[in-house]
From Swiss-Prot:
Signal sequence interval, chain numbering: none
Organism in which the protein naturally occurs: Arabidopsis thaliana (Mouse-ear cress)
Domain bHLH residue range list: 128-177
Top-rank taxon, per record: Eukaryota
Keywords: Developmental protein, DNA-binding, Nucleus, Transcription, Transcription regulation
UniProt entry tagged with the keyword Nucleus: yes
Intracellular or extracellular location(s): Nucleus
Record GO terms (molecular function): DNA-binding transcription factor activity; protein dimerization activity; sequence-specific DNA binding
Protein name per UniProt: Transcription factor HEC1
Function per UniProt: Required for the female reproductive tract development and fertility.
Length: 241
């Protein structure tokens, strides 16, 4: 196959003696000035480098080099962009699902904050200014630090995070708790309006109250976490407020 192609090419070249004959006067030095683009290596290299530049098309000086944006390259770049976007979306979805699972476990855990753990560290060999403005600023910083230390123990994993990450996680945790309280309120309204509910629980903005009524209603379905878990979740929401 290769030999046939080579023979055919040689046959075609033989039909062009003016261009292919090495003894032809076309290749003489006298014609170098006539065809500078063919024989001037410097010009050829510069011209070749210009055509290889991105954003250049030979003959127009505009647009792009056609060889640099082949259909396969364009298609592969679009495919890679879509795949990267889908991977980012999947990572975001997995992160949100993992965060929600951690939050659901955290709302079931009792909260116990040791007062000694949130006390400000004792300063040693530090001269404390008696200036009123300095004293007020120091007290303000101490209150902020104390609240941050308390918040670290309320947010799941907050003690292992830096302050910025912990505050960001606290925002997600508060949104999760508000969503859970809202869903429980909606369930309380739905189950409470169905022919009387004995011992049903009403969850309001200020906490939980028990209401008794006639009939044989079943009360509130606590979304699989039980009454204790619901009390704990509402308590966590109130503390974070």
């Amino acid at each position: 196959m290769d030999s046939d192609i080579m023979n055919m090419m040689m046959h075609q070249m033989e039909k062009l003696p003016e261009f292919c004959n090495p003894n032809s006067s076309f290749f003489s030095p006298d014609h170098n000035n006539t065809y500078p683009f063919l024989f001037n290596s410097t010009h050829y290299q510069s011209d070749h480098s210009m055509t290889n530049e991105p954003g250049f098309r030979y003959g127009s000086g505009l647009l792009t080099n056609p060889s640099s944006i082949s259909p396969n390259t364009a298609y592969s770049s679009v495919f890679l962009d879509k795949r990267n976007n889908s991977n980012n979306n999947n990572n975001g979805t997995n992160m949100a699902a993992m965060r929600e699972m951690i939050f659901r476990i955290a709302v079931m855990q009792p909260i116990h904050i040791d007062p000694e753990a949130v006390k400000p560290p004792k300063r040693r060999n530090v001269r404390i200014s008696k200036d009123p403005q300095s004293v007020a600023a120091r007290h303000r910083r101490e209150r902020i630090s104390e609240r941050i230390r308390i918040l670290q123990r309320l947010v799941p994993g907050g003690t292992k995070m830096d302050t910025a990450s912990m505050l960001d996680e606290a925002i997600h945790y508060v949104k999760f708790l508000k969503k859970q309280v809202q869903s429980l309120e909606e369930q309380a309204v739905v189950t409470g309006g169905g022919g009387g509910g004995g011992g049903r629980v009403l969850i309001g903005g200020g906490g939980m109250t028990a209401a008794s009524g006639g009939g044989g209603g079943g009360g509130v379905v606590m979304k699989g976490c039980g009454t204790v878990g619901t009390h704990q979740m509402v308590g966590n929401a109130q503390i974070l407020r």
